């Protein structure tokens, strides 16, 4: 299925089931009113002694019925799905990038003599609505209590006085687009027939975070437990001076068997174990490093619950976030115990808002 490489069999099966169920329901609802089952539903209207009968069901004027359904469908598509906004914005020019985009090639970026290491953690589908209501979320009890505590006690970029975040713009609402937006300052806007092409994400003419750090002596490393080729992630990061370790790297290095496949590749518990190994190697290399990683357990549908975690909430997705929150907190605690921590900045960010209600 196009765009679904690396997805779990369960996720694909659920999507197919939802699609089939919706298709069956809509067709049943739309076709039933036109069928004659030997019974009619009518309305009798009396006026000035005359009686007129109107047949409601079955519908005889199929063309008129089809036109009404078409108008309703267009209205739904335009308002609920946002098609009208999409069409309107497609023909509108914006000065956003003209006014706010800064070309790194045109400014002087100065680094201190002792350069800070950077650990950049992209957390799949993680947003601040996961925290407790008292701090800006939507839950009575936070499903990411550790991340909530970290945000409260460290620097947090918010759009409110409470815990909040950024509003995603066009071209930043899926993983590779979000990673490009956060490391290059631009959205991923490609043609539909080019969306899965590696050429669409190369951005050879753009100076990115990886380029800036590499030119200043940093080692850039990207770790993920899925296939880096998916969505053009390998093309983008390898083109901008990152060494990449993904699912297939783990197979090649003998960390997992070639027939091992859990969720999107291998689960986050292994991801954090491998991250510790790579960080120790990078720290011992003697050069400043930028270690970027991407989690996956909290991807929809319903996320993945690691075997080390238990069900705390009634919703499966909430349990997935709660489990991921615990693993991230443990990982950060481990980092804080390392010698390189005092000279390291940690960035925790969701790649994009959740795709599941």
Go through each PLM region and give its residues.
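Residues that form generic nucleotide/phosphate-binding pockets
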Residues: 44, 96-100, 150, 278
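Solvent-exposed soluble domains appended to multi-pass membrane proteins
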Residues: 104-357
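Arginine residue identity/basic-tract feature
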Residues: 35, 39, 47, 64, ...
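Short extracytoplasmic/periplasmic juxtamembrane "stem" segments immediately C-terminal to an N-terminal membrane anchor
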Residues: 91-110
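Transmembrane and membrane-interface helices of multi-pass
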Residues: 1-90
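Low-complexity, intrinsically disordered regions enriched in charged/polar residues
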Residues: 56, 77-81, 85-91, 120, ...
């Amino acid at each position: 299925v196009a765009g679904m490489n690396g997805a779990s069999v369960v996720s694909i099966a659920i999507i197919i089931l939802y699609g089939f169920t919706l298709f069956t329901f809509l067709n049943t609802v739309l076709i039933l009113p036109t069928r004659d089952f030997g019974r009619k539903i009518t309305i009798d209207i009396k006026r000035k002694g005359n009686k007129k009968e109107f047949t409601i069901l079955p519908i005889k004027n199929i063309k008129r019925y089809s036109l009404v359904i078409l108008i309703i469908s267009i209205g739904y598509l335009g308002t609920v799905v946002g098609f009208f906004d999409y069409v309107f914005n497609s023909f509108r020019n914006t000065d956003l990038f003209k006014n706010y985009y800064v070309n790194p090639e045109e400014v002087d970026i100065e680094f201190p003599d002792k350069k800070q290491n950077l650990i950049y953690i992209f957390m799949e589908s993680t947003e601040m609505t996961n925290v407790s209501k008292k701090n800006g979320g939507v839950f009575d009890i936070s499903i990411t209590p550790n991340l909530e505590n970290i945000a409260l006690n460290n620097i947090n970029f918010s759009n409110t006085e409470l815990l909040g975040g950024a509003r995603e713009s066009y071209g930043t609402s899926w993983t590779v687009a979000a990673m490009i937006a956060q490391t290059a300052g631009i959205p991923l806007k490609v043609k539909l027939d080019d969306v899965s092409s590696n050429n669409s994400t190369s951005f050879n003419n753009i100076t990115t975070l990886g380029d800036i750090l590499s030119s200043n002596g940093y080692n850039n490393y990207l770790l993920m437990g899925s296939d880096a080729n998916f969505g053009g992630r390998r093309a983008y990061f390898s083109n901008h001076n990152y060494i990449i370790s993904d699912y297939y790297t783990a197979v090649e290095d003998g960390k997992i068997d070639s027939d091992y496949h859990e969720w999107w590749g291998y689960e986050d518990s292994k991801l954090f174990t491998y991250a510790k190994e790579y960080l120790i190697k990078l720290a011992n290399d003697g050069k400043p490093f930028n270690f970027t990683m991407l989690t996956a357990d909290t991807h929809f549908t319903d996320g993945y619950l690691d075997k080390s975690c238990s069900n705390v909430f009634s919703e499966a997705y909430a349990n997935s976030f709660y489990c991921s929150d615990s693993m991230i907190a443990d990982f950060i605690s481990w980092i804080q115990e390392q010698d390189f921590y005092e000279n390291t900045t940690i960035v925790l960010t969701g790649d994009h808002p959740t795709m599941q209600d």
